[in-house]
UniProtKB/Swiss-Prot annotation:
This is Rhamnulose-1-phosphate aldolase. Binds 1 zinc ion per subunit. It catalyses: L-rhamnulose 1-phosphate = (S)-lactaldehyde + dihydroxyacetone phosphate. It is found in: Cytoplasm. Belongs to the aldolase class II family. RhaD subfamily. Its cofactor is Zn(2+). The lineage of its organism: Bacteria, Pseudomonadati, Pseudomonadota, Gammaproteobacteria, Enterobacterales. The keyword Nucleotidyltransferase does not apply.
Length: 274
């Protein structure tokens, strides 16, 4: 048996959370990450599991996730400290066979619970499992500075917000041709915001929480991080463009269409018509 601290998924979570903090996206205990695992991923580390796993109830049944394994950031844990004490900052859990609760097999050594946004993560995992036929395994939430800033000055319309980001950096249309979904401002940590987010995840791999942050998804931690990083870089460009007096020229609709054809992606049609 191997030590779970050296596992690819613990090490991956350490790197992702450290990188997110260094980017300035996750102040204090802001942000949360979850990675769906397989039984094969966790089996080699069973010797590190708690002999009597603690059981917790879910806020609503999630039968679609029955028996699924996850590694998740802990509630109230600072991302800057994950690298210092991953065993307290992270948690490996398995959803019950009836989907009504979960058991904590490793982590949270000083007590506590998984992220307060667990409902949002799980609801989005269910949707992305269906949309991508199980390919997407990561849900990542952070407080990306410039995306938040743009939510104060741009109309909160999916097509218009997406178009702005596509124009902010040539690679954006290639990286997220499905655009950015937007939910209304809502109280975080509730089933309601989880419902709204997962509904947008049916069509978008990025979902903006105005005045709060961004949700991203992908097959790997690198994919989800890179997705958010790309959108945030474009948002930073557009914040700077506004500070310099606004656009004098930009990428045209025809050029965006040509870009999609060159890279074999289908851009969200409504964003092309803005």
């Amino acid at each position: 048996m191997q030590a779970i601290l050296s596992s690819w998924f613990v090490q991956g979570m350490i790197k992702a959370t450290s990188d997110m903090w260094l980017k300035g996206w996750d102040e204090r205990n802001g942000g949360n990450v979850s990675l769906r695992l397989t039984a094969e991923d966790v089996t080699p580390y069973e010797s590190d599991f708690y002999p009597q796993p603690r059981h917790e109830a879910l806020s609503q049944p999630m039968p679609a996730l029955a028996d699924c394994w996850f590694i998740v950031t802990g509630s109230g844990k600072f991302f800057r400290n994950v690298q210092l004490d991953p065993a307290d900052s992270l948690v490996v859990l398995q959803v019950d066979s009836d989907g009504k609760g979960y058991r904590i097999f490793w982590g949270l050594t000083n007590g506590g619970l998984p992220t307060s946004e667990l409902a949002s993560h799980f609801q989005s995992h269910i949707v992305r499992m269906g949309v991508t036929h199980g390919h997407d395994r990561v849900i990542m939430h952070c407080h990306a500075t410039n995306l938040i800033a743009l939510s104060y000055v741009l109309e909160l319309d999916t097509a218009k917000f997406t178009r702005e980001l596509w124009e902010g950096s040539t690679e954006c249309l290639v990286v997220f041709p499905d655009g950015v979904g937007i939910v209304p401002w809502m109280v975080p940590g509730t089933d309601a915001i989880g419902d709204a987010t997962s509904e947008q995840m049916q069509r978008h791999s990025l979902v903006l929480w105005p005045f709060h942050g961004i949700f991203g998804t992908g097959p790997t931690l690198d994919d989800a991080f890179g997705l958010i990083d790309t959108a945030e870089k474009s948002a930073e460009v557009m914040v700077k463009v506004r500070s310099m007096g606004g656009k004098k020229q930009t990428i045209s609709t025809e050029e965006l269409i040509a870009l999609g054809k060159r890279f074999g992606v289908t851009p969200m049609e409504v964003a092309l018509r803005v």
